[in-house]
Amino acid sequence: MEAKLSSIQIPVDQDELSGTLLTPTGIPAVLFVHGWGGSQHHSLVRAREAVGLGCICMTFDLRGHEGYASMRQIVTRAQNLDDIKAAYDQLAGLPYVDPQSIAVVGLSYGGYLSALLTRERPVEWLALRSPALYKDEHWDHPKMSLNADPELMDYRQRVLTPDDNIALAACADYKGDVLLVEAQHDAIVPHPVLRNYANAFVNARSLSARVIAGADHALSVKEHQQEYTRTLIDWLTEMVVGRRIALAKEVVAARKHRLKQQSDALSSPGQGTNEFRGDIRAVENSSS
C-alpha cells in the first residue's frame, strides 16, 4: 500500500494557485473463501460491507459446490487449495489491485485452506472464522472421507503444534495480521482448535481473537451473524483504513519537514517559502 503527495497548480484567471494532491495508489483487495457445504452467497454480505471501505472483493465457489456439486464426493483438499490459488491469482492480477495489500477471509474448511494459502501466496491480512483442522495424511483423498474418520473429533480436541499439522506450520511462518473468530458453542470446530491456531501464530505482526457468545458453528442466529460481520468489518477497517491514514500522515509530515529544510537553507531571514514543489511517496512494508 502506498500514499502519494504531489504539488499541483490550479489555473484561475491569469494566476495559478498552489495546491497539494494527496492520493492512495493501488487498491486493497479481499478474497472470501467459504466453508465445506457452503457457497459464495454466504460471503456476499461481508463483501458488500468491505467494498464500502474501498476494497476490491472477490467471492467464488470451490469445486464440489454449486456449479461443481457433482464433484462433491471426489474433490480433494489439494484441488480446493488450487481453486483458492486460482482465485487469488485472478484477483491479484487485476490492474487496479495492489498485490501486496490482499486480505483473505476463510470460514471453517475454507479457513483451514486459507492458512495453507499463506505459504504459497502473499497474504497481508488473514481472517479465520472457526477454522477447521484435519490430519495431514491422505492429502489427495476425497475431502468427504476426512469427515468419515471416526477419530476426527478426538483429533480436534488435542493440543497440537506446528510440528503436528501443516496448517499450523503455515500459521507459524505467517508474518501478517490475523483475526481469529470463535463461536462459543461450536460442536464442529471446538475451542481447542482455535487455541491451537492462536498458539501457532508466533510470528504474526498482530493477532486479534474474538468469541461470539452463545453462537454455534453455523451462526444460526441472525444476531450472531451480524456480530461476526461487525467484528470482521471493524478489523478490516483498522487494518486497511488505519494503514492508509498512517501513510497519509507520513507524507504530510515529510512535506512539512521538507518545507522547513527549504526555509532553513535560505540565508536571509524572512525569505523562506511555504511553497512545496514535487512528489512524496510513503510505502508500507508488506509482511511478505
Where are these regions (language model features)?
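Short beta-strand/loop motif that positions the catalytic acidic residue
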Residues: 174, 180-182, 186
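The serine-hydrolase catalytic nucleophile loop
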Residues: 36-49, 62, 192-193
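Short alpha-helix in the alpha/beta-hydrolase fold that links the catalytic acid
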Residues: 176, 190-200
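Catalytic histidine-centered segment of alpha/beta-hydrolase-like enzymes
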Residues: 215-226
